[in-house]
């Protein structure tokens, strides 16, 4: 098991959207647990999940991303959002990041609804979109990772490697049918959406290229090939 704890990229301005999203998800989880205690847990499943008890509704492609099945589900998603969201928010700006997160959640929900057609809940699709954008913007940024494999150790891994492993696991789990209750289609749709959006933003010049993004690394590799 690999758990991201942080990155070596400095944050140039305080994050606002990322902690706000975390607070909203935590608040929604508290309300969920309270509703469960009153015997009204079916309210959330029927009205706010993708393909809940009342079928599909467009607004649920937003609301599902603020709800979680249990504490570990919430904690894992919020940890990934904290680690990867703050650098992406710093790069895209608050409005741009909020738009990426919400649109990424919608894209992930639609992908799940199209191919899975079963109930879905959780921020992981939106967080995957943020992570996919991170891969384009900061592919060589090092991720501080807690590694559980017989022994517990701390390691630094490049973003392309860590995120690549996450994507590969989702693909393999989906193909092999071992994903269980994990909505791998939503994850993969989120990764693809975030990657494409960040790629287009850089390619079009809507955000400035920097020496460490995917485009700059590609140019550096091309120049090295030319000098060989």
Q: Where is each model-derived feature located?
A:
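A detector for small-residue-rich transmembrane helices and their helix-helix packing motifs
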Residues: 1-228
């Amino acid at each position: 098991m690999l758990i991201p704890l942080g990155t070596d990229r400095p944050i140039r301005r305080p994050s606002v959207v990322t902690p706000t999203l975390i607070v909203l998800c935590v608040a929604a989880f508290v309300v969920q647990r309270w509703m469960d205690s009153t015997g009204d847990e079916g309210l959330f499943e029927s009205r706010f999940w993708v393909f809940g008890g009342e079928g599909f509704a467009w607004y649920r492609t937003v609301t599902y991303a603020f709800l979680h099945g249990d504490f570990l589900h919430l904690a894992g998603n919020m940890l990934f959002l904290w680690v990867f969201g703050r650098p992406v928010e710093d790069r895209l700006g608050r409005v741009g990041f909020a738009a990426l997160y919400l649109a990424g959640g919608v894209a992930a929900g639609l992908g799940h609804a199209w191919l899975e057609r079963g109930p879905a809940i959780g921020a992981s699709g939106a967080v995957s979109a943020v992570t996919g954008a991170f891969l384009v913007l900061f592919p060589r940024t090092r991720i501080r990772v807690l590694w559980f494999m017989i022994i517990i150790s701390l390691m630094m891994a490049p973003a392309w490697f860590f995120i690549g492993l996450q994507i590969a696991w989702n693909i393999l789990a989906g193909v092999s049918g071992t994903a269980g209750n994990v909505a791998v289609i939503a994850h993969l749709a989120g990764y693809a959406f975030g990657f494409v959006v960040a790629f287009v933003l850089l390619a079009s010049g809507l955000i400035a290229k920097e020496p460490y993004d995917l485009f700059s690394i590609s140019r550096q590799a091309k120049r090295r090939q030319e000098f060989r």
